[in-house]
A protein has these predicted regions:
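Auxiliary, metal-adjacent structural segments of Zn-dependent hydrolase domains
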Residues: 1-64, 71-75, 113-115, 119-121, ...
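Short amphipathic alpha-helical segments and their helix-coil junctions
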Residues: 62-64, 97-111, 147-157
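Hydrophobic beta-strand residues in large extracellular and virion-surface proteins
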Residues: 66-68, 82-83
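Post-HEXXH active-site segment of zinc metalloproteases
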Residues: 76-77, 91-125
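Short alpha-helical catalytic segment bearing the HExxH-like zincin motif
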Residues: 77-86
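Short alpha-helix boundary/capping elements
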Residues: 90-95, 122, 135, 151, ...
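Short helix/loop segments within enzyme catalytic domains
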Residues: 130-154
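Pan-zinc metallopeptidase signature
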Residues: 149-257
């Protein structure tokens, strides 16, 4: 099932309506925005992957689609899912360049496993505070739930030995620092990392200062500049080859967000 913006607008809260309107009004892209359910997603792309993903934003040649698992009855959870994807769509519409798939296996693997997740986290750093402060939609609540689950169920099983293991720990640390604003839960994260991976925490804290400067700053060039800074810091510690860096980091983009 596909629904139009107007059909969805009639089902959502005034705050989410305002976010939806603002995310579309500044765009010159002629492609319409549609909303699809899980069945529509399966028909076009297959099953949601990973399975715990409840929503995603997909650009197509003739339209944009925000998929959520069900769109018949939009409740609080679905509203948060829509707000989350509107954040990504908004940055896309206002000039943050996408990263296209490549046939180079090493580059694509680097994007899928590290550079892509890092960019997503940094996009969250831009719009989580913006959406909460301007539209009173609190995406941090979901982040805090995931953080608590991470500390309890996932972190104990992660190792801190090889470089890939350290990078995974680093990504998770930054992710939950960005996606939660619960001081108690974050303090638990700090304590757990201090015991398990202090070396990773020290690097991540340095990266985090760069990432957190993005909060509510709607400027594509600034985003790219901050992303590049994180890669330079990472290169010092992990010697990540520049040839694997994402294309959007080096391409010129003058759009304002």
């Amino acid at each position: 099932m596909l629904k139009t913006v107007n059909e969805i607008r009639s089902q959502i809260s005034p705050n989410l309506q305002n976010l939806l309107n603002d995310s579309l009004i500044e765009s010159n892209d002629p492609r319409p925005l549609k909303f699809g359910d899980e069945q529509e997603y399966k028909a076009i792309k297959g099953n949601f992957s990973p399975t715990d993903i409840n929503a995603c934003f997909c650009p197509f040649k003739d339209k944009f689609i925000i998929f959520i698992k069900q769109i018949d009855k939009i409740k609080c959870k679905e509203e948060c899912d829509i707000a989350h994807e509107l954040g990504h769509l908004w940055l896309f519409l206002l000039g943050l360049p996408p990263e296209k798939k490549t046939t180079n296996r090493d580059r694509q693997m680097a994007w899928d496993t590290f550079f892509g997740p890092l960019r997503e986290i940094m996009e969250h750093a831009v719009y989580y505070p913006l959406i909460k402060n301007k539209y009173q939609i609190d995406l941090y609540k979901i982040g805090t739930e995931r953080l608590n689950n991470f500390i309890k169920s996932q972190l104990p099983n992660l190792k801190n030995e090889s470089e890939p293991e350290k990078l995974l720990l680093l990504l998770n640390y930054i992710k939950y620092e960005v996606e939660s604003d619960d001081h108690y839960a974050l303090e638990r994260l700090h304590n757990a990392y201090s015991k398990k991976a202090l070396d990773v925490k020290n690097i991540a804290d340095r990266l985090l200062r760069v990432v957190q400067e993005l909060a509510s700053i709607r400027d594509a060039q600034f985003f790219i500049s901050q992303y590049r800074k994180t890669l330079k810091i990472l290169d010092i510690h992990f010697c990540i080859p520049v040839k694997l860096w994402p294309n959007f980091v080096t391409q010129i983009n003058t759009c304002r967000l």
